[in-house]
C-alpha cells in the first residue's frame, strides 16, 4: 500500500473516530498520520482514583504552594477531574481576586444535578446524567458585579467610576435566552458517584474560568497551574521563570513529544466543545461547528495524534490558516512540545495572512513616521491651528495621573494622560486651535476602557454596544469621562460643543480598539475620518487552554458594536474614511496635513 493511500485511509478512519467520539460515546484515538486506534465504552461505570498535586495561583511562591486533589477515571491517569466543591472554592477565590467584589456561590446537590447560584440569584445547573450545563442567564452568571448586564468597561462595582474616570450615565439592556452546553455531544463525561460530583479540569477551565476572564488552568501531569496564559509568565528573554520550570520542567525536560491516546482524544473533543461555545465569530467564518471543521480538514485527525508537536501544529494551523482573525492567536505550546516550539511554528509557517498583513502595514507606517519624527512622535503636538493627539495603544494606565503636569508634556503617560493633557490645552483660554486630529494610524488596539475614555472626551458621551453571540444578549451603555479628574463630569471634560473641527486619522493598521473608536466616530456628524480604511476587529479577547497544555487567545462571544436606528452593527468591517489620503508620507508630514485639513473647513 503506498503512503498516500495509507494517509487517506487513516484520515477516513480518524473521521469515523471523531464522529463517534463527538456524538456521545467516549473514544480514545491515536492518529500519527498512518494509523488510528480506538476503544469505546458504552456505559458510564467508573473506578475513581485520586492524586494531590502542587497548585500555583498566578505565581511561584515556594512558601505558599497549595495542594489540590485531582481525580482520574478508569485508570486514565492524565485526564484529571476536579470535584465540584473544590471547583467552587477556586471559582470564588479567583473571581474575588480579580474583581474584589462580593462574589459568592451557593451549591445545591439533588440526585444527578448540581445547581450553582450566584449572590445575584443567577444560576447554572450541571446535569451529571446528561452531561450538560444549563444557564438561565449565561451573562448574569459569568459577569463580574457591574451596573449593567454586560459591561466590558466598568466590570467591577459602582466605585469603579471614581477609579477609571468614567461614569455610566445610561444603559439599555436586552437579556439573552437560556443557554445549554451539551458536553455529551462531544464525548465528554461528567461523573456522579456516591455523594461526589466530578467534571473534567479542562471543562472547568474552559467553561467557568475563561468566560469570566479569570485565566486558564494548566496541568502537566505533575502540577496544577492557574495563570493568565501568557508565555511571559513561563519564559522571558530565553530563560525559564520559576513557574516555567514547574510547567515545562527544569531546562524544558518535560518536552518528550508524547501524549497518551486517551489525553489526545479528550483534548480534541474538549477543544471543539470550548470553541463551539466560546468563539464569537463562528458563523462569520462559516464554521457550523468545530467538530465538523475537523472532519472538513484533511489534517483535522492530527488533533488525535499521540505526538504533542503534531497536535500543536494542527492547533497552530487552525488558528492561523482557518480562523486568521488577528485576535485569535496561538500563545503557548504544550509542555510536552517545549516552550520554544511556538517559535518554530511561527518561523516555519507564519502567524497567519491577516496578522502578517497588519505587521507589514505597521512596519511601513512606523518607518515613514520615523522619517518625520526620528526621536519619536509626541503624544500632543500643535502645528499651526491644528492639535495632534497620538498613541499607538489604548492603555488603562491610571497609575501616573497624579504625576501629570499640564505645563510639562514630558509628564504625559499613556492614553489617559494624553487625553487629559490634550483636552486641557485645547480648551485653554485664547487657544489658537481650530482642528483636532486623533492619530490612530499606528494604533493596534488595547484596553476598551481607554478607548471609551477617548470617545467620551471627543463626543461628550460614548455609546458602546455589546452583543453576546452565545446568549443573544444586547446591551448599550453610555459613558461620560472625567478628563481632568476633579470628580465632576461636565463641559470642561470634553472637546464636544466647542466649535472645533474634529478628525480621526486611520490606516489599515488601526485594529481592535483602534478600529472601534473611528467606527463610533463614523456615526457621529461632528467627527470626520481621514486617511485609509481601518482594519476591523469586533470582539473582545478571551483565552482558553487545551488539555494537552497549549494556550490560545480567541475572539470571545462579546462583540463590540455601534447602534444606528435601533439596530446593532459590529465593527469588524472597519470604518471608511470621509477624506482619503493615498500617499503614506502625507500621514506624518503634519505641515501638509494641517494645510489639507484647513482646506476642508
Segments predicted by a language model, with ranges:
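C-terminal "post-core" interaction segments
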Residues: 233-258, 268, 431-432, 444-601
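N-terminal secretory signal peptides that target proteins for export/translocation
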Residues: 1-4
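Flexible, low-complexity junctional segments that flank or bridge functional domains
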Residues: 125, 133-436, 440-444, 449, ...
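Sec-dependent N-terminal signal peptides
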Residues: 6-18, 22
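Extracytoplasmic Gram-positive cell-surface binding/anchoring modules and repeats
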Residues: 66-109, 187-203, 210-220
Amino acid at each position: 500500500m503506498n503512503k498516500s493511500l495509507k494517509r487517506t485511509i487513516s484520515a477516513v478512519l480518524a473521521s469515523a473516530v471523531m464522529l463517534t467520539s463527538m456524538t456521545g460515546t467516549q473514544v480514545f484515538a491515536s492518529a500519527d498520520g498512518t494509523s488510528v486506534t480506538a476503544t469505546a465504552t458504552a456505559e458510564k461505570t467508573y473506578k475513581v482514583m485520586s492524586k494531590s498535586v502542587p497548585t500555583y495561583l498566578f505565581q511561584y511562591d515556594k512558601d505558599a504552594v497549595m495542594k489540590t486533589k485531582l481525580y482520574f477515571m478508569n485508570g486514565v491517569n492524565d485526564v484529571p477531574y476536579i470535584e465540584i466543591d473544590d471547583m467552587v472554592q477556586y471559582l470564588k477565590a479567583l473571581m474575588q481576586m480579580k474583581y474584589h467584589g462580593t462574589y459568592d456561590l451557593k451549591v445545591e446537590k439533588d440526585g444527578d444535578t448540581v445547581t450553582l447560584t450566584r449572590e445575584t440569584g443567577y444560576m447554572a445547573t450541571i446535569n451529571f446524567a446528561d452531561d450538560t450545563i444549563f444557564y438561565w442567564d449565561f451573562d448574569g452568571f459569568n459577569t463580574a458585579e457591574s451596573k449593567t448586564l454586560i459591561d466590558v468597561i466598568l466590570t467591577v462595582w459602582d466605585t469603579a467610576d471614581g477609579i477609571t474616570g468614567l461614569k455610566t450615565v445610561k444603559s439599555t439592556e436586552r437579556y439573552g435566552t437560556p443557554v445549554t452546553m451539551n458536553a455529551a455531544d462531544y464525548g465528554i463525561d461528567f461523573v456522579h458517584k456516591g455523594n461526589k460530583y466530578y467534571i473534567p479540569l479542562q471543562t472547568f477551565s474552559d467553561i467557568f474560568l475563561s468566560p469570566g476572564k479569570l485565566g486558564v488552568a494548566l496541568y502537566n501531569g505533575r502540577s496544577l497551574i492557574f495563570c493568565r496564559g501568557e508565555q511571559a509568565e513561563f519564559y522571558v528573554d530565553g530563560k525559564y521563570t520559576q513557574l516555567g520550570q514547574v510547567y515545562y520542567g527544569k531546562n524544558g525536560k518535560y518536552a518528550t513529544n508524547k501524549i497518551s491516546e486517551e489525553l489526545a482524544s479528550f483534548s480534541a473533543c474538549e477543544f471543539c466543545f470550548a470553541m463551539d461555545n466560546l468563539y464569537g465569530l463562528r458563523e462569520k467564518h462559516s464554521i457550523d461547528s468545530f467538530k465538523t471543521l475537523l472532519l472538513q480538514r484533511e489534517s483535522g485527525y492530527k488533533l488525535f495524534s499521540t505526538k504533542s508537536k503534531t497536535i500543536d501544529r494542527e492547533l497552530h494551523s487552525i488558528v492561523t490558516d482557518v480562523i486568521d482573525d488577528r485576535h485569535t492567536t496561538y500563545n503557548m505550546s504544550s509542555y510536552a512540545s517545549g516552550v520554544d516550539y511556538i517559535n518554530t511554528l511561527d518561523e516555519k509557517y507564519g502567524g497567519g495572512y491577516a496578522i502578517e498583513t497588519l505587521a507589514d502595514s505597521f512596519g511601513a507606517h512606523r518607518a515613514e513616521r520615523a522619517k518625520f519624527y526620528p526621536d519619536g512622535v509626541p503624544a500632543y503636538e500643535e502645528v499651526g491651528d491644528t492639535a495632534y493627539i497620538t498613541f499607538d495603544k489604548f492603555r488603562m494606565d491610571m497609575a501616573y495621573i497624579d504625576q501629570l503636569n499640564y505645563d510639562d508634556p514630558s509628564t504625559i503617560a499613556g492614553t489617559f494622560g494624553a487625553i487629559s493633557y490634550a483636552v486641557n490645552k485645547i480648551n485653554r483660554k485664547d487657544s489658537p486651535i481650530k482642528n483636532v486630529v486623533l492619530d490612530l494610524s499606528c494604533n493596534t488596539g488595547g484596553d476598551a476602557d481607554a478607548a471609551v475614555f477617548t470617545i467620551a472626551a471627543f463626543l461628550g458621551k460614548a455609546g458602546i454596544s455589546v452583543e453576546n453571540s452565545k446568549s443573544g444578549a444586547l446591551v448599550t451603555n453610555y459613558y461620560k469621562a472625567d478628563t481632568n479628574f476633579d470628580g465632576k463630569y461636565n463641559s470642561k471634560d470634553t472637546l464636544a460643543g466647542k466649535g472645533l473641527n474634529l478628525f480621526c486619522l486611520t490606516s489599515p493598521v488601526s485594529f481592535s480598539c483602534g478600529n472601534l473608536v473611528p467606527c463610533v466616530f463614523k456615526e457621529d456628524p461632528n467627527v470626520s475620518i481621514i486617511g485609509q480604511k481601518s482594519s476591523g476587529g469586533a470582539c473582545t479577547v478571551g483565552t482558553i487552554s487545551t488539555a494537552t497544555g497549549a494556550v490560545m487567545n480567541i475572539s470571545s462571544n462579546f462583540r463590540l458594536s455601534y447602534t444606528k436606528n435601533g439596530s446593532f452593527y459590529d465593527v469588524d468591517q472597519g470604518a471608511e474614511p470621509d477624506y482619503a489620503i493615498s500617499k503614506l508620507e502625507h500621514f506624518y508630514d503634519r505641515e501638509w496635513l494641517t494645510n489639507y485639513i484647513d482646506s476642508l473647513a
